[in-house]
Each structure stands twice: as C-alpha cells, then as structure tokens.
C-alpha cells in the first residue's frame, strides 16, 4: 500500500506546500521584502502599491520578492514569514496568470512614480 487514504492523496497537499515553501525560502534573499500573493491578503489600489514601492525604495529595501502559492495555496510557514500579504480580489487565479498580473502592477506602479501617463485614474 501507499500508506495514504483510499485515493492515495492523504497528506499530499501539505507535503507539496512544505516543499514549495522550502524552495521559495532558499531562493529568497534574507534582506528582501517578502510579499505573499494570497486571496486573504489586503487589496491594494495601483496608487497605493506605487506608494509602498516608493516608501520601500526610500527606506533602502534592497529587494522585493513576490511569493505565489502553489495549486494548494501557500503554506502556513510562507504566511508567517511574509512581510505583506496582497490579494488580487477574493478569487483564485491560475499561477501563471498571477505572474503576469503582478508584473503588470509593478510596471504600473513604476510608471505612476515616474509620472508616465500609462496609468489613468
């Protein structure tokens, strides 16, 4: 037997979450500001995100790391270690789409800070 329940999945999500968290911790510089993308996080307007980026820049934060949970969500250890938790609404989004969404929001925030007309209120 596989030691799991009838469908062989007992403990799999938690194990996957632990492995994903370990890989993210290993890849994240200690000095980085860690932002977890999580449906239970705070929702930031684009200008609010720009203000946060400016504050972190002015405070000398050397790097930002955006963590995206896997298919089963983020582990509790990621939630505990995150400096901020950001939500793109309460919906669940595909991992690859979230990568594009956060990239666009970072770009948008930078254009807001530089006075570029890309963002319109």
Where are the regions a protein language model picked out?
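S-adenosyl-L-methionine/SAH cofactor-binding core of RNA-modifying enzymes
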Residues: 2-65
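Conserved nucleotide-binding/hydrolysis micro-motifs of P-loop NTPases
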Residues: 41, 72-74
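Rossmann-fold NAD(P)-binding glycine/threonine-rich loop
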Residues: 69
